[in-house]
Amino acid sequence: MTLRRVGFVLCSSAAQPIPSTRIAVHNMLPFLLSAGLQPVVLFEPMQPSETPDLTDVAARAVETGCDLVVLQKVHGTSAVALARQLTAAGVRTIYLVCDLTDVPMVEATDATVVVTEYLRSLHPAALQSRIHVVHDGIEQPVACKSDWGSGSGTRGCPLQAVLVTSADLDRLPVVVRPPAWLNVCIVGRYATGLRRWRHIRWTLARQRPGERLDYLRFLVDRRIECIPWDSQGVYREMAQADIALIPIETLADESGGEVSPAWKVKSENRLTMKMSMGLPVIATPIPSYELVIEHGVNGFFARSAHDWGACLTALRDPARRREMGMAARASVTQRYSMEEQATKLIRVIRAISESGH
């Protein structure tokens, strides 16, 4: 089959895409076009939804002449039914997912694309041949630090660290309080103005006394700044930082080990973004990060508060920051480039178009 038209079923709209839709789909579309593939968006919800009603999407795919349909992060009864309807109509299917295992979706589609080797490993052995890894591509490969500073950090002239998160953190994980010679800027999902103050009041009201005291200490700590994420500001903050932090609270798996906790299935996206900027990174070791960082060479791993203190102290040396930052960038820019990931995705699309699985 000569494949030309590829349909997409999305879990968020093009007008307001969630990060996974932007990175896994919209960033890939120009590369698909260059490869002679014509993308067609068959479905996009007004509000993000992983379990939308996909009735009539199969008919739309057939009407528009789609040879293959990619289902991005959608799952549930309607998504499984759609995959089966497409198969019955002779249309190949690919399930694109970044943060969970869904055996019914994997079984209903011709191939599954996941973002990490670890997420692939969580699937049953009998399904491994259907599962392919396409990482999140680095979105701003040109953005890079040009100055790693000459200071070692003092109380009066502290070094600057940046932590980029998709959450509205109410504490600095693991580290808790930065040393006197370091300021930390947390770029996250923070509200602004009156909405921010309302959120603080609501958070304080629901906390227990001990938690409330810790939160108040976090709020008044002059060495910690919390700012809202935006697509330009996040790169500005990273460019101004001396060090990047990714502290993750690795809580015990309350499910008894049958389901991996959310922190374990995180992609390496935030890590490679910071490394591509040329930042020396200290991170909590999680499965996806362990395949990227060579401890002490292109980044640091830290588990305990003591580990974090030792790694932070090592990066007070400006020469070490520069050396590690440059090594970090060199190790990820090609391997995790959008071009490289698009090549992998196109390879899967073409392979599925030529065979059953």
Q: Can you say where each PLM-predicted feature lies in the sequence?
A:
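Conserved catalytic-core segment of nucleotide-activated headgroup transferases in glycan assembly
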Residues: 16-30, 34-35, 140-141, 147-240
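Extended catalytic core of nucleotide-activated donor transferases of GT-like folds
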Residues: 43-128
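Conserved acidic donor-binding segment of nucleotide-sugar-dependent glycosyltransferases
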Residues: 268, 293-306, 313-319
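Donor nucleotide-sugar binding/catalytic pocket of nucleotide-sugar-dependent glycosyltransferases
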Residues: 110-145, 149, 160-165
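N-terminal pre-catalytic "stem/leader" segment of glycosyltransferase-like enzymes
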Residues: 1-71, 75-79
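Nucleotide-sugar-dependent
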Residues: 231-276, 283-291
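A charged, aromatic-enriched C-terminal amphipathic alpha-helix characteristic of glycosyltransferases
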Residues: 20-23, 28, 141-142, 148, ...
